[in-house]
Amino acid sequence: MSLFEGKKVIIIGDRDGIPGPAIEKCIEGTGAEVVFSSTECFVUTAAGAMDLENQKRVKTLTEKHGAENILVILGAAEGEAAGLAAETVTNGDPTFAGPLSNVQLGLRVYHAVEPEFKEEVNEEVYEEEIGMMEMVLEVDEIIEEMTDIRTEFCKFLD
């Protein structure tokens, strides 16, 4: 079964990384439904934490659709910011400031530059929408951070 098939996708893009609309275009035709997409400024939020409104939206959508049906795709420009966002949607808000404080959703979460994402989307669309950013991002650092968070906190490892 594919990563996207039948999933409800929450996209949290980054103004300095990969924006939400670029990730959305990549997901078209995968069998997933994008239920929320935004583009944030990760360095603008307090200590790089996930925006409180986005935390609320993630929580509400997870309650509506079920955690097992949710897939979160991030576009953060840095590994640390991606890790904080991934930790928030899996283990709860590490800053204890938002609606996901002490809420362990365990959601599936990937970054748009990870091989698991790239392998599932149209290669031409990926190159057009994300390829240039991939060249300037610290891809290995992002992959390592995301893998560590998933291994430790994700409840739905396929």
Swiss-Prot record:
Enzyme class label: oxidoreductase
Matching InterPro entries: GRDA
Active site: 44
GO cellular component: glycine reductase complex
UniProt KW keywords: Oxidoreductase, Selenocysteine
Catalytic activity: acetyl phosphate + [thioredoxin]-disulfide + NH4(+) + H2O = [thioredoxin]-dithiol + glycine + phosphate + H(+); acetyl phosphate + methylamine + [thioredoxin]-disulfide + H2O = sarcosine + [thioredoxin]-dithiol + phosphate + H(+); acetyl phosphate + trimethylamine + [thioredoxin]-disulfide + H2O = glycine betaine + [thioredoxin]-dithiol + phosphate + H(+)
GO molecular function terms noted in the UniProt entry: betaine reductase activity; glycine reductase activity; sarcosine reductase activity
Pfam families: GRDA
EC numbers on record: 1.21.4.2, 1.21.4.3, 1.21.4.4
Function: In the first step of glycine, betaine and sarcosine reductases, the substrate is bound to component PB via a Schiff base intermediate. Then the PB-activated substrate is nucleophilically attacked by the selenol anion of component PA to transform it to a carboxymethylated selenoether and the respective amine. By action of component PC, acetyl phosphate is formed, leaving component PA in its oxidized state. Finally component PA becomes reduced by the thioredoxin system to start a new catalytic cycle of reductive deamination.
Family that this chain belongs to: Belongs to the GrdA family.
Quaternary data: Monomer. Component of the glycine, sarcosine and betaine reductase complexes, together with components B and C.
UniProt protein name: Glycine/sarcosine/betaine reductase complex component A
Organism: Clostridium botulinum (strain ATCC 19397 / Type A)
Gene that this sequence comes from: grdA
